[in-house]
Every structure is written in C-alpha cells, then in structure tokens.
Amino acid sequence: MSDVFDIIRFNDQGLVTAIAQQHDTGEVLMLAWMNREAIEETLATGRVCYFSRSRNGLWRKGETSGQVQTLIELRVDCDGDALLVLVDQPGVACHTGRRSCFYRAMGKDGTVTTLTEPLIDPHTLYGS
C-alpha cells in the first residue's frame, strides 16, 4: 500500500484540486484546493479542511457557516493531480446558500440558466 503523499502531484503553489462529492447520492458539491497540511488535518480529524487561496491559509469547511463536511473517503485520480473527497454534507456546500456550487447550466447556445435557488440566505450563514 502506497502513502498518499507518494502519489499526489501538487502544483507549483503546493496545491491540488479537490472535488467534494456527497458520498451517498453522487452529487458534486464544490471544487476547492488542498495542500499537504489540509490533507493531513482532514485525514487526522475526519472533518474536511481545504486551503483558501484568497485567505492564504487553511479553511476548515463549516468553521464560519456551520456547514461542516465529514470525510467518508479520499480518492486520488490516475494522474495524482486531483482529489475526490467523498463527504457527508447535511446542509448547503456553497457560499451562496445553495446545496451545490454547480447551480448554473450553460446551454449549447451559451445561455446560462440558474438551476436552483438558495436554500439558506447567505447572510444567515456568514453575517452581513
């Protein structure tokens, strides 16, 4: 059995793409980034931690909003440059108050349709 860090290929900034997916439904929830420290914390605690590029630091999912992701399984793709984070996400995953960050669909003609409305007011999640 290999060590996970032997197969993950981090980019020049020490980050790897992480796709969060609801473990029991297959719903794609969000895309984020992880560094080694975020992966180590996630594996150690079972609570998903990402790396925030805008804040340049660890982002413990749900720390502010209460919308915690619990790790079910961590998978590495064939090239080692992307992670699939299978999670249990009871509430919303998106900062817009939606279940998934992928709530817009683009038609072949380029028009964009909003598929879902917010389930929670973002101000309720994060304050004003």
Swiss-Prot record:
Pfam family, one: PRA-CH
Keyword Zinc: yes
Described purpose of this protein according to its UniProt entry: Catalyzes the hydrolysis of the adenine ring of phosphoribosyl-AMP.
Molecular functions per Gene Ontology: magnesium ion binding; phosphoribosyl-AMP cyclohydrolase activity; zinc ion binding
Catalytic activity: 1-(5-phospho-beta-D-ribosyl)-5'-AMP + H2O = 1-(5-phospho-beta-D-ribosyl)-5-[(5-phospho-beta-D-ribosylamino)methylideneamino]imidazole-4-carboxamide
Record's GO cellular component terms: cytoplasm
EC number: 3.5.4.19
Subunit details: Homodimer.
Protein name, as recorded: Phosphoribosyl-AMP cyclohydrolase
Pathway stated in the Swiss-Prot or TrEMBL entry: Amino-acid biosynthesis; L-histidine biosynthesis; L-histidine from 5-phospho-alpha-D-ribose 1-diphosphate: step 3/9
GO BP annotations listed: L-histidine biosynthetic process
Gene3D superfamilies: 4.10.80.70, Phosphoribosyl-AMP cyclohydrolase
Cofactor note: Binds 1 Mg(2+) ion per subunit. Binds 1 zinc ion per subunit.
